[in-house]
Amino acid sequence: MISLKDAIKLSSSDIVKLRKNLKDKIKDNRQLGAYIEQLTNSDISDEYAGVPIAIKDNIQVKNWSITSCSKILQGYVAPYHATVVEKLLKAGLAPFGRTNMDEFAMGSTTESSFYGKTLNPLDHTRVPGGSSGGSAAAVSAGLAIAALGSDTGGSIRQPAAFCGCVGFKPTYGRVSRYGLGAYSSSLDQIGPITRSVEDAALLYDIIAGHDPKDSTSSNLENISTSDKLNSDRKLTIAVIKNYVDGASQDVKDSLYKVVDKLKEAGHNIIYKDLSNSKYDIAAYYIIATAEASANLSRYDGVRYGRRADSNSLGQMYSKTRGEGFGVEVQRRMLLGTFVLSSGYYDAYYIKAQKARAFIKLEYEEILNEADIMLMPVAPSVAYKFGELSDPLSAYLSDIYTIGVNLAGLPAITVPVQSDKNGLNISAQLIGGAWKEQDVLDAAFGLEKLVKGN
């Protein structure tokens, strides 16, 4: 598959050929379910001309049916472009196909999608990760040059790691969220999934920057990174020892091999611990579900999307939501409503916000001593479908990614090794706020070390 770096240099006629070849390949691999069009046996959405970029189904593309993979949004057609889509089009890139995801980005496997699950290209019996599982699977399988996803608690990084791709979550506020179907507004961030660090930097440069339409968008000057990538920078890297030691043996062994390579390459390695990740889990699921219960209250059958047959307004609300939302979305909305309710707000929500401030401070203290933090992406390689059927077990699969969202920091996942079954193991690199260049340089250097370049 051609790289994004090379694709943007193609002539118009070559881009047309590339798009046709991709369409044919997508049709031939329908069983993967990376695109909604594969799951619904329909033609790929491709009416915009340019270098094709796969788009997660919660990012608005004008005149496309954008549903966040939920039954409740069936029939909705986006009346406008998300800011990131406008930036793609301006740069000569174009949205190409709607990638599958967990319903409203709530999940880690794509199994909660209304359309059906996506298979992991490395092993069809295993999950691709989530919620951006379709984007990661499409890139991994060569069905996309690159893709956009969204990351609320690891939803770009975890599927990228499970499928063997590079997944980059920028600093919160660096990329506009205007036009992103909101799950948790203080945590959500759009970012790229690609096959290389260089392509991730290129796509990030295109979509980043201030947007007056997004009140949380930073107005700091956005400096390009891809033209400054430096794999030879010597950095101080803090290895989060208790997180590495807490991962599976395969992940642990692979990451310590990576640490040895980084030492040999001249990087300064220090070892640090973070507080027990159970605090991250508790704070994240209180804050995220509280914000989700507010964000998803707009889906009531009145303004847009699916409306259930009913005899009264109250019945319409309850039936529309009961029939339109999946089990996991209902679970999180109920939890969010509970923690915001009178009598529990102080006990849960306020405490969670205090815990979030503590978690952010912990990350900042380590990053005052180091340029980069290194830790696992997930406790293990991609697991089999149905293996984590208990919701709590599934939530714990995100223990190494959610703290980054709570702290609002940039982070990237880089494939470093395959296990004996051919499943990918990735390292997660985290940098200080607004220091995307540090993160991308570290990732670029690690990628070259791993490949032996």
Swiss-Prot record:
GO terms for cellular component: glutamyl-tRNA(Gln) amidotransferase complex. Disulfide bonds: none annotated. GO terms for biological process: translation. Its EC number is 6.3.5.7. One of its GO terms (molecular function) is ATP binding. Belongs to the amidase family. GatA subfamily. This is Glutamyl-tRNA(Gln) amidotransferase subunit A.
